């Protein structure tokens, strides 16, 4: 009887231990905090030269065998596939599976991959390790798994929703972006992925971040759908002081568009992953900043307290704006960040980097706090990341928003009706919105405009646009010193009522 009683108690204790055990961000945070108190150890590459020195076309030949997708034999809507190391993805990351009772390392095997025509010694790849992973989910069709998340390289990750193709990227953390000292790129060194149940509609991923001057613990809850949403929680620790910390960084590409046309003839009218930075400031103001591809590094800062949101958007999705059948820029998502809680005082910062082609990401946006704690102290950030093609949801419903910004040579119509250039630069800015459409065409809409010390507004007028049922602002600007940037702002008003978001533009230097 005593033996049976002891056995029952042991079973109950086991059940209790199993039910109470749960992996959490705190488990990762303990590692991150411990690392922050030690010296940084750079990751060591174990990659044979044939993989490290390969070109992109060769790396593309290494394909994951889809019939060996992780969780393929489980009744779960989520599947995992892995990236092989190669090129600059030359250090392995650890990937673990979290179940209800344990954590298990997902071991690398070359059998996961088809190496195509890549000649290699099989013995040299048997213990290499993964470079990253991707998440598959039946987002577009119930009977087909589509890739919805890619985590590969440093702390980069890309996410898409239904009917979208990969475009801009998000990152875990940015350090000293655009500073003369050079940028530091933290990397996710280890991941823990919760095994989803058959009925789960979300996937939870934990990550350990490491770099010479910072460590961090991250939790990503991925919720796929028409808009795929990623709920992010991070605990960040500094090893040493940094010049600038970039929180919730986004990375994108802008080559050319109507505000900055292509310098060479191109059948594509626009070429970009994103065409503007949108900000919902802490004071309620909405700001739209069209992107540039400048000839020199450019940084724009928007100081505020407790931002309500910001993101890099792809406004205007008509195929005729892009005309690219291969890369489908019209299907690339916008990314919107919604902070949770108060983030305090700081700046939303935009960095624009010169590029000659679309293969380089040259746009970065992030939040940078004014005050940073001493090394070792914990910083907490929570936010949601929404990847969407529904930009109508990403601005105030009662505010008009900027549909397009077009640049032209400024001119004056002569008495003979011929337009004569007058040395100015002209901007055409179209505002549209649901509430604006309801206004009678004869509403006395006006513009509040301003320009920095390096420019002068020569002419400004607003007229009704019967095509868009909105209003068009036309500006002619005189630049004093073409070697300097020129800042300008504008918003539409009706008497004392603000009708639109603020158009905030920086004319790059030497244009």
UniProtKB/Swiss-Prot annotation:
For molecular function, the Gene Ontology terms on record are: carbohydrate binding; catalytic activity
> Where does this polypeptide localize?
Periplasm
**One cellular component GO annotation, for this chain's record?**
outer membrane-bounded periplasmic space
Q: What InterPro entries does the annotation carry?
A: Gal_mutarotase_sf_dom, GH-type_carb-bd, Glucan_biosyn_MdoG/MdoD, Glucan_biosyn_MdoG_C, Ig-like_fold, Ig_E-set, MdoG_OpgG
User: Pfam families annotated for this entry?
Assistant: MdoG
Write the signal peptide boundaries: 1-22
* Gene Ontology process terms (BP): beta-glucan biosynthetic process
Q: Which keywords describe this protein according to UniProt?
A: Periplasm, Signal
Q: Quick check: keyword Protease in the entry?
A: no
Claim: Coiled coil is one of the keywords in the record: no
Metabolic or biological pathway, per its Swiss-Prot or TrEMBL entry: Glycan metabolism; osmoregulated periplasmic glucan (OPG) biosynthesis
Looking up PANTHER family in the UniProt record yields: GLUCANS BIOSYNTHESIS PROTEIN, GLUCANS BIOSYNTHESIS PROTEIN G
Known role:
Involved in the biosynthesis of osmoregulated periplasmic glucans (OPGs).
Q: Which family does it belong to?
A: Belongs to the OpgD/OpgG family.
The protein depicted here goes by the name Glucans biosynthesis protein G
């Amino acid at each position: 009887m005593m033996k049976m009683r002891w056995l029952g108690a042991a079973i109950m204790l086991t059940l209790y231990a199993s039910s109470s055990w749960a992996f959490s961000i705190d488990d990762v945070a303990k590692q991150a905090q411990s690392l922050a108190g030690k010296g940084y150890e750079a990751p060591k590459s174990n990659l044979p030269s044939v993989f490290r020195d390969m070109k992109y076309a060769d790396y593309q030949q290494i394909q994951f065998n889809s019939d060996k997708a992780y969780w393929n034999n489980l009744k779960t809507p989520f599947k995992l596939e892995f990236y092989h190391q190669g090129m600059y993805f030359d250090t392995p990351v650890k990937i673990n599976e979290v179940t209800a009772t344990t954590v298990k390392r997902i071991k690398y095997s070359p059998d996961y991959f088809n190496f195509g025509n890549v000649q290699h010694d099989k013995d040299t790849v048997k213990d290499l390790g993964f470079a990253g992973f991707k998440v598959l989910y039946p987002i577009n069709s119930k009977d087909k798994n589509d890739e919805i998340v890619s985590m590969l390289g440093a702390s980069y990750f890309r996410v898409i929703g239904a009917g979208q193709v990969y475009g801009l990227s998000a990152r875990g953390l940015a350090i000293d972006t655009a500073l003369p000292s050079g940028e530091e790129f933290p990397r996710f060194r280890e991941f823990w992925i919760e095994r989803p149940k058959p009925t789960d509609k979300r996937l939870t991923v934990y990550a350990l971040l490491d770099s010479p001057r910072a460590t961090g613990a991250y939790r990503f809850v991925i919720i796929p759908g028409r808009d795929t949403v990623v709920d992010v929680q991070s605990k960040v620790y500094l090893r040493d002081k940094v010049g600038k910390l970039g929180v919730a960084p986004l990375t994108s590409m802008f080559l050319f568009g109507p505000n900055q046309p292509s310098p060479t003839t191109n059948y594509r009218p626009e070429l970009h992953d994103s065409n503007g930075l949108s900000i919902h400031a802490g004071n309620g103001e909405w700001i739209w900043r069209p992107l540039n591809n400048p000839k020199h590094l450019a940084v724009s800062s928007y100081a505020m307290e407790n931002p309500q949101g910001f993101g890099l958007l792809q406004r205007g999705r008509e195929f005729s704006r892009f005309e690219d059948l291969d890369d489908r820029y019209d299907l690339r998502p916008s990314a919107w960040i919604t902070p949770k809680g108060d983030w305090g005082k700081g700046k939303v910062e935009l960095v624009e980097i010169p590029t000659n082609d679309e293969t380089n990401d040259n746009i970065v946006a992030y939040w940078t706090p004014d005050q940073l704690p001493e090394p070792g102290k914990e910083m907490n950030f929570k936010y949601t990341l929404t990847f969407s093609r529904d930009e109508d949801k990403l601005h105030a419903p009662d505010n008009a928003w900027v549909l397009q910004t077009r640049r032209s040579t400024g001119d004056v119509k002569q008495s003979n009706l011929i337009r004569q250039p007058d040395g100015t630069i002209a901007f055409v800015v179209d505002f549209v919105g649901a509430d604006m459409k309801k206004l009678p065409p004869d509403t006395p809409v006006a513009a509040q405009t301003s320009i920095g010390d390096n420019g002068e507004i020569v002419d400004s007028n607003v007229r009704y646009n019967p095509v868009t049922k909105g209003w068009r602002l036309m500006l002619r600007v005189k630049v004093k010193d073409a070697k300097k940037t020129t800042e300008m702002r504008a918003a539409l008003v009706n008497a004392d009522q603000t009708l639109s978001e603020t158009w905030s533009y920086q004319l790059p230097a030497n244009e």
